A protein has these predicted regions:
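Type-3 copper protein
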Residues: 1-2
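A structured, charge-rich N-terminal accessory region that forms the first stable segment of a protein
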Residues: 6-99
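Active-site-adjacent substructure of cysteine-protease-like catalytic cores
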Residues: 33-39, 44-69, 98-150, 155
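Generic structural hydrophobic/aromatic packing signal, biased to beta-strands
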Residues: 49, 94, 105, 117-119, ...
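Noncatalytic regulatory segments and standalone regulatory/sensor domains
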Residues: 148-252
Length: 334
């Protein structure tokens, strides 16, 4: 599609990147043939933002090496601000929201600066079939285009780039028919990019980042703590019902499974970046991700009140994670 056609459809507005939702192609990490199609709104969002800035997001997945379980949940993994700064010259900092959010977004776009914004998924059409016009949920987006006159916004969310219009525009920015006073101010971050650092590349800093995450991982195998929590929660899941199950599974199985699958991508990257042998960990990470999916299916039966036995898949998840981490540590060093 030509730039003129994009402008005709989306309007002129303010934008940082020339993107069109119709022709946008997500990063290969977000192909549909994955075991876990999504991680969480923040990780998936940053993969696409980095991809659209012309950078490879894979080095920023180093957080998988320090991810763990505190006995209550698997880490809500995030691409770390310090890694964004080290690898890409990108500084991410919380904004003081003292004006209507739309004003901050527009001012940022006018200055060539993106922001992350917490919004209500109820107004995001890309979530059709889940939260869109059905359920109020917190999620994070990065607006890239705003046309205030025509009420159009182009935005990054989860695994892609989308647009919304009309009543959804009003809803996202709490505009119509008038602002609701009880709506809390969202968490907003400014994304400042040092183009010189981004364009120059990161040299061997990606390996330094990998070693730093390995060095600060908790002792022991975090999957053992995860397994204990899952087993302890079986009675809760059996009585709480399907809706509660989805929330429970997100914080334990989806976060772990997606972390393991991203780790497979990451170690394959490391293997070609001066850590030969790291790719040998990828099959173990993918088996761990598949194991988490199998446990999720069994726990879905528990959510319908059935008895489940999880010993075998949980043991295999733990073994695969341990084997993978040993291989990575040996290849990368600390």
């Amino acid at each position: 599609m030509s730039n003129d056609a994009v402008l005709d459809r989306l309007g002129t507005g303010l934008r940082v990147l020339e993107l069109d939702p119709i022709t946008y192609r997500p990063h290969p990490i977000h192909n549909h043939d994955r075991i876990w199609t999504e991680t969480n709104c923040y990780v998936d969002l940053w993969i696409e933002v980095l991809h659209s800035l012309g950078a490879d997001p894979t080095p920023a997945l180093a957080f998988v090496l320090s991810a763990g379980c505190d006995g209550r949940q698997w880490d809500f993994v995030k691409i770390m601000p310090e890694d964004l700064r080290t690898l890409y010259g990108i500084d991410v900092a919380e904004m003081n929201v003292w004006r209507p959010v739309l004003e901050h977004v527009v001012e940022g776009l006018d200055d060539g600066i993106h922001v992350t914004v917490e919004v209500d998924g109820f107004w995001l059409p890309d979530t059709a079939g889940t939260s869109y016009r059905n359920q109020h949920t917190k999620t994070t987006i990065v607006p890239n285009l705003v046309n205030r006159e025509d009420k159009v916004m182009g935005y990054f969310h989860n695994r892609g780039y989308f647009d919304l219009t009309g009543a959804d525009f009003d809803g996202i920015f709490n505009l119509a028919p008038e602002p609701h006073a009880e709506v809390l101010l969202p968490y907003v971050e400014q994304i400042r990019v040092d183009s010189a650092v981004l364009d120059a590349g990161f040299g061997d800093r990606d390996l330094d980042v990998a070693r730093a995450h390995l060095a600060r991982r908790a002792p022991g195998n975090p999957v053992d703590a995860l397994a204990r929590r899952i087993v302890a929660d079986i009675p809760l899941v059996q009585t709480a019902g399907p809706d509660a199950f989805h929330l429970w599974s997100f914080g334990l199985l989806r976060q772990f499974g997606a972390t393991a699958e991203l780790a497979a991508n990451y170690v394959e990257y490391l293997d070609g970046r001066g850590a030969p042998g790291a790719a040998a960990a990828a099959p173990h990470f993918r088996d761990a991700a598949s194991g988490a999916k199998a446990v999720q299916f069994r726990m879905a039966r528990a959510a319908r009140g059935r008895d489940v036995v999880l010993d075998e898949p949980l043991i295999e998840m733990s073994k695969n994670w341990a084997a993978a981490m040993d291989l990575v540590a040996g290849a990368v060093g600390t």
